[in-house]
Each structure stands twice: as structure tokens, then as C-alpha cells.
Amino acid sequence: MSDSQTLVVKLGTSVLTGGSRRLNRAHIVELVRQCAQLHAAGHRIVIVTSGAIAAGREHLGYPELPATIASKQLLAAVGQSRLIQLWEQLFSIYGIHIGQMLLTRADMEDRERFLNARDTLRALLDNHIVPVINENDAVATAEIKVGDNDNLSALAAILAGADKLLLLTDQQGLFTADPRSNPQAELIKDVYGVDDALRSIAGDSVSGLGIGGMSTKLQAADVACRAGIDTIIASGSKPGVIGDVMEGISVGTRFHAQASPLENRKRWIFGAPPAGEITVDEGATAAMLERGSSLLPKGIKSVTGNFSRGEVIRICNLQGRDIAHGVSRYNSDALRRIAGHHSQQIDAILGYEYGPVAVHRDDMITR
């Protein structure tokens, strides 16, 4: 084995169930065995687990429930405890303790809570405890959810200071087309940057048990790679896949980490789920992307959502493309009032000002 590394392993519902309606315990046993072997060799392992809703549905005998958020949260509340018990039971076979962390988007949006979560996660790792992370589906609403465990795993990798992120799925990796419908589809083995062409070929999962598809895995890979973390999408059913990844053996699709990774504050900005969105005109788009300029109120066309000063927001061009994330200097109501106006007019419009820019270039990451 090489020197100690930190690996985040994300296990989707389709991997944990094998595409069935219940958890595939035999397969989970094998995945834990691989993780335990790496743990014994001195590596630091973080698990990001899906499967709470599937576990709850199985435990309750597959009840007929309405397709509502409340039903999903009911199943998650029942299943989360069952799921963590399973992880605890299996890792205890190898004398390994686990620590559960349930996160929501609010833990990532707020810088102080982000740092607290980071400190907790790293304390677990420093004490040779395997963190088991999931989104707090039992209480999270659409407004406070990260949205899927792919993006959650990228955030976990940033929190952990991971070397590698492994996204295990029901596919071998990213293909040039959907291999389920196109026999000519070829596996893409290496990716050196996520672009629009790559996003256009990403399809969706068809397991029906989870909410993450290949597009969310691309988002996660983009975030992790820009933070300096190699990301691999591979099949969870491939024998020895976790060990192979740690050994550097080529499996699935490898997204190579950015050579000059973002510094810590910008990792948070890039990874934090946006609290709102603004659309900017062509002049502002060119200024930010081509000249690295700050965003001025004059270039703002519209503001979507309600957010506070200091929160991370998404910046889109007129075609709706996500071109940047940044920390807003003004809240959403203030931005709506000063949108399209020159910076010299801010004080006259609002009665106060926090400077001439809406988002400063030092608080911005372009996509």
C-alpha cells in the first residue's frame, strides 16, 4: 500500500440494493470488508451512504404510501436508524467504530457551520473512527436539502481534505452515450475537466430507488476536482473496486484533480449549495469570465430566491447557464432594487451601501 490517504466512498441506493427493493446485505458486507482492509492499512475512510428510505420501506413491509415529502421523511426516519445499525454492526466485526453525521444544506451554506462540520469530521478521522454521512432526510425540506448524495459526497470530501472521492454506482462509469440503449457507447476512462459537451451526454439513473443520476455525479466530480480531489465513478459490483482505486488501478472513469486547486475559502464557495440565483447581461458575463472582474449591480437583470448578505449565490448568463458562484454583498431584496443601476446610485436607492460591487471577484468562482 502507498502512504496513508483519505478516501470518501459514496454508495448510492442502487449499489446498496442491487436494483431490488431491499438492502443487499451480502454485498454491503463485501464493501465493508474492502473498507476495513484499507482502514487496517492506515488509510482514512469516509462513507456517504444512501438507502435510508429503502431501508425504512423494507422494515415497514413495503407500505402503500402517498407520493409525498412527508411519506419519504417517514420512511427516512424509520430507515435511518436501521441503516446506521447495519453499518455499525458490520464495521464492528473488524473492531472499527463509526460515527454518524447527518447534514443539511444549512451546514454548508453558513461558513461557521461548515467549519464546525469540518472539525467534527476530521476529529473522527484523527481518532480512527469511520464517519458515516447522510443527508438528514427525516427533517430536510426542499429548501434545506443539498439535493442528492453525490453532491453531498463532494462536500464531504472537501470537509475531510480527501485525496480521492469514489462514486459507486450501477454503471461502469461515464460513457460516450447511454450504454443501456446504445451498444456503440464507449467508456470514458479519463476526464481532465467537466465541460458542456460532457454534461450533454450524462444520462439519469433508472433504478427508481434513488434521486442521483450521472448528471449529479458530474457536478460532484467538478466540485471535487477543482478542490484538488481525484474523483472516480465506478461500478459498485466490481470485485475489489475500492482497493483498486486506492492502489491507483484504472477502473471506471477517473476525473483528474485540478493542478492548481482552489484555496480553502473558495472551496467552500464553490461547494456550498447556492441560496439563490441572479441572471446577468452579456457585458457582465464577459467582464467576469474574460477579465476576472467583480459583478456590478448594473449588469444584473433579475434576482431569484430569498437570501441574505454573505450567502453563496449562483450567477447565470442570459441563456440560463451557470457561469459562477459567489458570496453576495447584498441581500436579495436589496439586489432587486439596485439591479440595472450604476454603483454610484446604491446609497441613494438603499440608504446605505456595502461597497460598489454585488459580488466581489475575490469571493467568486467562475465555472
From Swiss-Prot:
Any single Gene Ontology cellular-component annotation: cytosol
Catalytic activity: L-glutamate + ATP = L-glutamyl 5-phosphate + ADP
Pathway involvement of the protein, from the record: Amino-acid biosynthesis; L-proline biosynthesis; L-glutamate 5-semialdehyde from L-glutamate: step 1/2
Gene3D superfamilies, per the entry: Acetylglutamate kinase-like (3.40.1160.10), PUA domain (2.30.130.10)
Chain residues that bind substrate: 50, 137, 149
Molecular function in Gene Ontology: ATP binding; glutamate 5-kinase activity; RNA binding
Chain sites annotated for binding ATP: 10, 169-170
Family to which this protein belongs: Belongs to the glutamate 5-kinase family.
Protein's name in the database: Glutamate 5-kinase
Source organism: Salmonella paratyphi B (strain ATCC BAA-1250 / SPB7)
Gene name for this UniProt entry: proB
